[in-house]
């Protein structure tokens, strides 16, 4: 009996292994992918890719397999690109082939291929072209984006003055002001800083970005086929984004009730007008789902990335007080103590510009980039990537490529200055990605970073609560994003 039972268990195990191998073979793509660590059926490369240090795991694998290699995220093969040359060759030199959006499973349940950031094919081209046009028109219209940022910076300075030099956590001070800039474009108005609905919205955005960077989210991205049916923290992202969608859908209803097609007030109005124009076209991409999700894409990206960069920037400037002093000297020389900073000042302030670039480079807010996908069978560096293969361009590995930055792991503004102290560009500076999927809001984000940093440092000096040498810039969480550590500082009026 015991032998018979053992034999039955053995047969069951063999049968289970056979089923796993059959399933594994079905998900294998034809073609010739780059080399990489040997995967375990279904589990993939879980043993080599730590869910709490995914980016660092990829860098370690690069040491063995080179700048282009394959890892299996669960049963799914993903091609990893490291360093400037490999990423540029794919995203710029072969821009069309690598222009697809890869799978971001942790939010796919919410977006289902809709919205400009996660769409593909003709839907993506239509939504991107429309979004770029509207952002450009608002940037050059009666009330430019620069004026909106300057106005919002003024409100922020007033809030900082109210603190009277007491210690504060800058997180929501910065997210409120940055979010109000994109709010004025997509919603047509700004929120009061104490608006409870606005604060709730910002907390959801902040929490979503954090949740997308947790080990749970990385695990979900690897095993979404199973984990979508299981309870746990990984589902928190889904519910947060659904709440954000509900908020935007409610704003759309408000706009629709008072829409004047001759006088669009914001991005939502412009999209609604296009929806009415295309109402008899059953195949139009101008529908309610794409409106809500594209608005969410713009609002989310326009809030969290810039405010996180500012938070990191405050830390780095306090850690290097000589840099803060030199920026203030440049502000005094070019702008003076009273005039409001403008974008035109940037070309006359090479050191400040270099510092802002170096903050973005060193902190690399989205180190793994957003996944790409090859839209057709693609020959790349002697390999064949079958149509539909996901590709991770590791932006963090480009921003810290030692071939292009002599001190890749240090804060060194001279990376962006020539021997005469003039600003110099660096082709490996890609915090907004590159190629056809480059960030829609790059111009706005660059404008915000310059105007906020100069406005704040023109009016306040930043003081840490610990000695500069003890300031730690290690991310609180590092996954999809590098989440800044929580800290307090004092803003002393000049």
Swiss-Prot record:
One Pfam short name: p450
Catalytic reaction annotation: an organic molecule + reduced [NADPH--hemoprotein reductase] + O2 = an alcohol + oxidized [NADPH--hemoprotein reductase] + H2O + H(+)
Top EC class for this record: oxidoreductase
Subcellular location: Endoplasmic reticulum membrane; Microsome membrane
EC nos: 1.14.14.1
Cofactor (UniProt): heme
Record's bilayer topology term: Peripheral membrane protein
Annotated Gene Ontology cellular component terms: endoplasmic reticulum membrane
Major localization class: endoplasmic reticulum
Gene3D superfamilies according to UniProt: Cytochrome P450
Residues bound to heme: 439
MF annotations from Gene Ontology: arachidonate epoxygenase activity; heme binding; iron ion binding; oxidoreductase activity, acting on paired donors, with incorporation or reduction of molecular oxygen, reduced flavin or flavoprotein as one donor, and incorporation of one atom of oxygen
The entry's keywords: Endoplasmic reticulum, Heme, Iron, Membrane, Metal-binding, Microsome, Monooxygenase, Olfaction, Oxidoreductase, Sensory transduction
Tissue: Olfactory epithelium.
General function of this protein: Cytochromes P450 are a group of heme-thiolate monooxygenases. This isozyme seems to be implicated in olfaction.
Family: Belongs to the cytochrome P450 family.
Protein name listed in UniProt: Cytochrome P450 2G1
Origin species: Oryctolagus cuniculus (Rabbit)
